[in-house]
């Protein structure tokens, strides 16, 4: 590695992975060889529907493997030097930070305030930082919690900076046992902080039990008789750094946009656009960082890390946003639910950084405001380009906001000292119908039209020709709590795959705009890979049923052991497993972690991906609409878990969801096929071979949690309704297979 220049704020390092490249190419050519074998079979034995299905599935696998190999072909890594940036404090640009929450029950306020507290304590001048909290649930409890958290922040932030505390989310900091570390003064201060935090927690818990929302008074009176989906806008400045003190507290603003039952609110994308407009009137910072309410700041230098890139002239001219990885603190041993995303964050996203840049993942990202206002990389400052009537059509009818947007597009930085003067104007831009006849959600701001608004927004930014960067600092920038069990991560995955498939068939598809946008070819392949992951369920299910059919109906679709061509599928299997294992070894994970993630990928494909495809088909037929579902946020601390609960943390759980029916059906079919095959009840001489048996056994092993769920009880067992439906479908499949032999 070359020694970095003394004046450089960052270094871009190209990572070499020759072994992985060789395996990728070998696997691809083996897939082509398998397809050639299928064509030879058709030539010698004639067209058979069994071979035709196998050929179509394997063609898809070859195509999808080419997309997959593209992801990690040219990985890069950025190394930043924030200490060098500290010499240029006066040059630091202002940053507006958005934190979004939607439901005080599914997303308890204590989680949100920990994220807010960790943000208020970052190493960045407080007079150039503003925190906006969007509450889509219009909860008096959330506002009260933020107001109480401010009192704690006044002693917490100085404590963190005085003692250089690394983890600045109180619930995580106080979960560590540090009783014997530090000076007596530090120990005294720490005990005082812990006691104050426990009191804060208790006040919030008491408020949750005692609030009578119809009779709120004082500062909470605005929340009286409000409903989450029917209320006027509520915007309150909880704290304003009026003196512009660098070592004080950043601005803290509460925002609850107006909602009306008859006006579409566009879920999180709509909330983000309201935050963009409100902040544009109050602070109008050129950079905006957004966080989910459960992703606290784990690295206090994180904004400095991003500015090391944005201060570079080339990056400032070509790059739209800096994305940080999503990491989790509740990492169970060997990742039993495959929800730590380590391979995605450490390998896939670094691979994308070597093309046009990573996708925008909805949290842990710093955007340039002018990019979200629609500016292209080769477009100069607007100057007199737009007339006033054009600007009103783009940004809406607020004169004050159009003025602030114009200043951004002209690269004029302003940072008003008094937020209260902007309060009246902010209510106008937070109304439910403000975006009517404007370009919000289409040409400017976060994009509408998909429940994965983050991916869509990032892709449209890339389509304009912008690039993005990916930073992986140590310690990780942000940490959250990964969902545990079975239904929650599967429902989250179903929502994502539904939104991705919606985008694929929309006018924003990377295929539909191939002739007109500025996506690089390999970046287009990346987005195709992402959008097609949901469709992957169909060929995988078809291919999973082929060995079972062969065992039941006494056919074969794989070469027999005595045939030399058996080497092709055998080598494919071995090299594919080896290629996957190398990724886990490279990221310091165990072989057991590879196995857990592999089987969870299979389970997700058969469960959530399939239901995502069905949901989109029903939407196309006009039978239903896709909806944005808020997932329950957890805030677990390992110190609170008992030994017995630790043993249950890695156990798979089930509910009444229909998504478990397909995979349970496939498991029953494999068990029935293996039983019929080994009992030898098929008519005539045995035709199926070792390949078909191996495939079925492999699927049973992959779906082992489902097999255990068939016999377990309670939440760890499959519901009787799921078992009955799956049994009926499995019986029907076996019956049709036996009928095909007659």
Per-range role (PLM):
Residues 1-467, 479-480, 490, 496-742:
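Glycosyltransferases that elongate glycans
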Residues 471-478:
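Membrane-helix and juxtamembrane interface regions of eukaryotic multi-pass membrane proteins
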């Amino acid at each position: 590695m070359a020694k970095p220049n003394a004046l450089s704020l960052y270094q871009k390092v190209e990572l070499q992975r020759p072994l992985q490249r060789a395996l990728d190419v070998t696997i691809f050519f083996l897939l082509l060889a398998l397809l050639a074998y299928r064509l030879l079979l058709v030539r010698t034995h004639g067209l058979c529907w069994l071979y035709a299905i196998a050929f179509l599935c394997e063609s898809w696998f070859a195509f999808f493997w080419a997309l997959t190999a593209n992801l990690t072909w040219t990985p890069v890594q950025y190394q930043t030097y924030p200490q060098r940036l500290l010499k240029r404090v006066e040059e630091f640009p202002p940053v507006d930070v958005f934190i979004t929450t939607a439901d005080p029950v599914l997303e308890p306020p204590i989680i949100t305030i920990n994220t807010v507290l960790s943000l208020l304590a970052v190493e960045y001048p407080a007079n150039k930082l503003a925190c906006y909290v969007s509450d889509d649930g219009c909860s008096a409890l959330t506002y009260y919690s933020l107001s109480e958290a401010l009192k704690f922040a006044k002693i917490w932030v100085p404590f963190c900076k005085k003692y250089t505390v690394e983890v600045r989310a109180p619930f995580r900091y106080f979960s560590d046992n540090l009783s014997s570390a530090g000076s007596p003064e530090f120990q005294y201060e720490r005990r005082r902080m812990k006691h104050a935090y426990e009191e804060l927690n208790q006040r919030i818990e008491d408020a949750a039990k005692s609030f009578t929302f119809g009779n709120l008074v004082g500062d909470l009176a605005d929340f009286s008789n409000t409903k989450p989906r029917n209320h006027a806008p509520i915007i309150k400045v909880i704290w304003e750094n009026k003196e512009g003190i660098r070592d004080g507290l950043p601005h803290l603003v509460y925002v609850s946009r107006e909602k009306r039952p008859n006006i579409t609110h566009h879920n999180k994308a709509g909330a983000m656009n309201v935050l963009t407009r409100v902040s544009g009137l109050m602070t109008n910072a050129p950079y905006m960082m957004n966080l989910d309410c459960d992703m606290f700041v784990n690295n206090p230098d994180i904004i400095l890390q991003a500015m090391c890139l944005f201060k570079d002239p080339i990056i400032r001219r070509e790059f739209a946003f800096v994305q940080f990885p999503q990491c989790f603190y509740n990492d169970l041993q060997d990742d039993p639910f495959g929800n730590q995303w380590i391979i995605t964050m450490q390998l896939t996203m670094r691979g994308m950084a070597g093309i046009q840049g990573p996708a925008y993942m909805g949290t842990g990202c710093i955007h340039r405001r002018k990019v979200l206002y629609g500016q292209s990389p080769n477009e100069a400052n607007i100057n007199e380009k737009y007339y006033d009537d054009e600007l009103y059509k783009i940004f809406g009818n607020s004169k004050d906001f159009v003025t602030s947007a114009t200043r951004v597009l002209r690269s004029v930085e302003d940072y008003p000292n008094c937020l209260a003067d902007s309060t009246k104007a902010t209510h106008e831009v937070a109304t439910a119908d403000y975006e009517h006849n404007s370009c919000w959600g289409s040409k400017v701001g976060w994009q509408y039209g998909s429940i994965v608004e983050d991916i869509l927004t990032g892709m449209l930014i890339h389509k304009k020709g912008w690039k993005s960067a990916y930073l992986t600092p140590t310690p990780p920038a942000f940490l959250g709590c990964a969902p545990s069990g079975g239904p929650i991560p599967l429902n989250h995955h179903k929502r994502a795959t539904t939104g991705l498939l919606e985008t694929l068939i929309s006018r924003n598809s990377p295929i539909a705009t191939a002739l007109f946008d500025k996506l690089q070819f390999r970046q287009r392949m990346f987005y195709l890979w992402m959008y097609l992951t949901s469709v992957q369920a169909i060929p995988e299910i078809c291919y999973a049923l082929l060995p079972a059919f062969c065992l039941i109906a006494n056919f074969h679709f794989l070469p027999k052991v005595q045939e030399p061509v058996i080497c092709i599928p055998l080598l494919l299997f071995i090299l594919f497993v080896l290629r996957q294992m190398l990724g886990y070894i490279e990221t310091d994970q165990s072989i057991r972690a590879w196995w857990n993630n592999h089987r969870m990928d299979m389970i997700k494909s058969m469960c959530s991906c399939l239901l995502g495809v069905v949901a989109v088909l029903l939407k196309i037929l006009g039978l239903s609409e896709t909806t944005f579902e808020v997932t329950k946020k957890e805030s677990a601390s390992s110190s609170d878990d008992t030994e017995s609960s630790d043993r249950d943390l890695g156990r798979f759980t089930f509910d009444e969801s229909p998504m478990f029916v397909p995979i349970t059906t496939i498991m029953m079919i494999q068990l029935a096929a293996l039983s019929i095959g080994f009992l030898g009840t098929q008519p005539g001489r045995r035709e199926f071979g070792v390949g078909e048996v191996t495939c079925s056994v492999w699927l049973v092993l992959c779906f082992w949690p489902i097999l255990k769920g068939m016999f377990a009880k309670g939440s760890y067992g499959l519901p009787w309704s799921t078992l009955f439906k799956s049994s009926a479908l499995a019986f029907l499949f076996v019956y049709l297979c036996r009928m095909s032999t007659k």
